[in-house]
Curated annotation (Swiss-Prot):
The keyword ATP-binding applies. Residues 309-321 have a biased composition (Polar residues). Catalyzes the covalent attachment of ubiquitin to other proteins. This is Ubiquitin-conjugating enzyme E2 U. Signal peptide: none annotated. Keywords: ATP-binding, Nucleotide-binding, Transferase, Ubl conjugation, Ubl conjugation pathway. Autoubiquitinated in vitro in the presence of UBR5. Transmembrane segments: none annotated. Pathway: Protein modification; protein ubiquitination. It catalyses: S-ubiquitinyl-[E1 ubiquitin-activating enzyme]-L-cysteine + [E2 ubiquitin-conjugating enzyme]-L-cysteine = [E1 ubiquitin-activating enzyme]-L-cysteine + S-ubiquitinyl-[E2 ubiquitin-conjugating enzyme]-L-cysteine. It comes from Homo sapiens. The keyword Cell wall biogenesis/degradation does not apply. It holds the Pfam family UQ_con. The lineage of its organism: Eukaryota, Metazoa, Chordata, Craniata, Vertebrata. The gene is UBE2U.
Length: 321
C-alpha cells in the first residue's frame, strides 16, 4: 500500500502532464516517486532564452508538510544559485516555515523557471554573477554560453558513447598451430632440430653394432656393461649444436673398444680407463670396419627387435636432453 506522499506526487505528476507547461519536463526516476529529474528552459526574451538547465528533486515521506530538496546537476552562473551546492535561492524551499501545503510540483517548477529568467539582485548567493550581470550584460551572456556548452552539445546530438567499454576491440583468437610455432621460436627449450644426434644416419653404425653383438653374444652381461659405458660417453661428449654439421665430423663412438676378455682380465678400474679412452679418441669408424670385413652374417630376428628397442631408447634420451 502506497503512502500519502506517493499519492500526492502521483496526483502532481498527472497535473503536470495535463497542463504541459512549455519549457518544463519532469519525470520520476524511482518506483516510490521520491526522486525526480527535471529540465527547465529559459523564458523567451530573457538572457537565458535557449538555455536548458537540468535539476534533481528529492522528496521525503513528509511531503507535502515539508519542502523537497532541489539541486542543479550543472550549476549555472546565476546570482540566485549557490555556486557550491547548486541549490536555488527560493524562500519557501530554503525556509520550511515559509512552505505551504498548497504548493505542488507544478508550482515548484514554475517558480524555478521564473527565478532563472528573472534573477533577484538583492542578497545574491553568487556575488560575482550578480556583479557582472549589473556591470556588463553582454559579457554575462558570453559566460552563460560557455557554462552551458555541454548542454548545447546534447541538443546537437554530439554525445559521447554511453558505454566506453564497447569501443574495446574484441580478443583475437589464435589457432594452436600458430601458438606452437611462436612458442618454438621464443621458448627457452628449443625444438627437436637442436641437440639431436642421429646415430642411425652414421655410416657403418648398424653393421658395427651387429658385429659387436655377435662377438659378445656369449657374454651378455659384459655386453650390457660395455653398452652402458658407451651411453655414458655419448652423454658426456654431446654438446649443444644444430644438425647442420657434416656427419663425418661427428665422433659418436670410439675406435678402441675392449673385448669381453679384456674387461674381466683387467682390474675393477678398467671401466674408468675405458671412459678415459673414449674422451680422448678422435678417430672415426675406419679402423674398426677393417676388423670385420669378412663378417657377412645376417642378424637374427631377435637381435633386430633388440636393436629397435635400443635405438628407441637412445633417441628418446638424446631428444629429451
Amino acid at each position: 500500500m502506497h503512502g500519502r506522499a506517493y499519492l500526492l506526487l502521483h496526483r502532481d505528476f498527472c497535473d503536470l502532464k495535463e497542463n504541459n507547461y512549455k519549457g518544463i519536463t519532469a519525470k520520476p526516476v524511482s518506483e516510490d516517486m521520491m526522486e525526480w529529474e527535471v529540465e527547465i528552459e529559459g523564458l523567451q526574451n530573457s538572457v537565458w532564452q535557449g538555455l536548458v538547465f537540468q535539476l534533481t528533486i528529492h522528496f521525503t515521506s513528509e511531503y507535502n508538510y515539508a519542502p523537497p530538496v532541489v539541486k542543479f546537476i550543472t550549476i549555472p552562473f546565476h546570482p540566485n544559485v549557490d555556486p557550491h551546492t547548486g541549490q536555488p535561492c527560493i524562500d519557501f524551499l530554503d525556509n520550511p516555515e515559509k512552505w505551504n501545503t498548497n504548493y505542488t510540483l507544478s508550482s515548484i517548477l514554475l517558480a524555478l523557471q521564473v527565478m532563472l529568467s528573472n534573477p533577484v539582485l538583492e542578497n545574491p548567493v553568487n556575488l560575482e554573477a550578480a556583479r557582472i550581470l549589473v556591470k556588463d550584460e553582454s559579457l554575462y551572456r558570453t559566460i552563460l554560453r560557455l557554462f552551458n556548452r555541454p548542454l548545447q552539445m546534447k541538443d546537437d546530438s554530439q554525445e559521447l558513447p554511453k558505454d566506453p567499454r564497447k569501443c574495446i576491440r574484441p580478443i583475437k583468437t589464435t589457432s594452436f598451430s600458430d601458438y606452437y610455432q611462436t612458442w618454438s621460436r621464443i621458448a627457452t627449450s628449443k625444438a627437436t632440430e637442436y641437440y639431436r644426434t642421429p646415430l642411425l644416419k652414421v655410416p657403418n653404425f648398424i653393421g658395427q653394432y651387429y658385429k659387436w653383438k655377435k662377438m659378445d653374444l656369449q657374454h651378455q652381461k659384459e655386453w650390457n656393461l660395455k653398452y652402458s659405458v658407451i651411453k655414458c660417453w655419448l652423454a658426456r661428449k654431446r654438446m649443444p649444436h644444430e644438425v647442420t654439421h657434416s656427419m663425418e665430423e661427428i665422433k659418436l663412438c670410439p675406435t678402441l673398444i675392449p673385448t669381453t676378455d679384456e674387461i674381466f682380465l683387467e682390474s675393477p678400474t678398467a671401466i674408468n680407463s675405458i671412459t678415459d679412452i673414449y674422451e680422448t679418441e678422435e678417430e672415426g669408424w675406419k679402423s674398426d670396419t677393417s676388423l670385420y670385413e669378412n663378417d657377412t652374417d645376417e642378424p637374427r630376428e631377435e637381435e633386430v627387435e633388440d636393436l629397435i628397442s635400443w635405438t628407441n631408447t637412445l633417441n628418446t634420451n638424446t631428444s629429451e636432453d
